[in-house]
């Protein structure tokens, strides 16, 4: 553990941010998994609704720097392609 007061504070702040980021990342992954699950059921309307719920969350995490913007774009592109391929 740190001895200097400012280093102790930084350690506390870092741990707080780590927990918050982990929570946000987990939430985002859950929304992505819901889209994959909806695609697996074969219902295009449900999959589209799940995607519409997921998209702003992924974009928000990318704008905050939690994930890279290209990763967000890759997730969205992959899922849209799968949804459009459904009948």
UniProtKB/Swiss-Prot annotation:
Family, similarity comment: Belongs to the bacterial ribosomal protein bS20 family.
GO biological process: translation
SUPFAM superfamilies for this protein: Ribosomal protein S20
Function according to Swiss-Prot or TrEMBL: Binds directly to 16S ribosomal RNA.
GO molecular function: small ribosomal subunit rRNA binding; structural constituent of ribosome
InterPro entries according to UniProt: Ribosomal_bS20, Ribosomal_bS20_sf
Region (Disordered): 1-27
HAMAP family named among the record's database cross-references: Ribosomal_bS20
Gene3D superfamilies: Ribosomal protein S20
UniProt gene name: rpsT
Pfam families: Ribosomal_S20p
GO annotation, cellular component aspect: cytosol; small ribosomal subunit
Protein name: Small ribosomal subunit protein bS20
Alphabetical keyword list: Ribonucleoprotein, Ribosomal protein, RNA-binding, rRNA-binding
Record's compositionally biased regions (Basic residues): 1-22
């Amino acid at each position: 553990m740190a001895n200097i007061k400012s280093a102790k504070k930084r350690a506390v702040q870092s741990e707080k941010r780590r927990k918050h980021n982990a929570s946000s990342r987990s939430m985002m992954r859950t929304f992505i998994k819901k889209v994959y699950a909806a695609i697996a059921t074969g219902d295009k309307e449900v999959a589209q609704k799940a995607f519409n719920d997921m998209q702003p969350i992924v974009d928000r995490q990318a704008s905050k720097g939690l994930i890279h913007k290209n990763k967000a774009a890759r997730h969205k592109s992959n899922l849209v392609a799968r949804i459009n391929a459904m009948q």
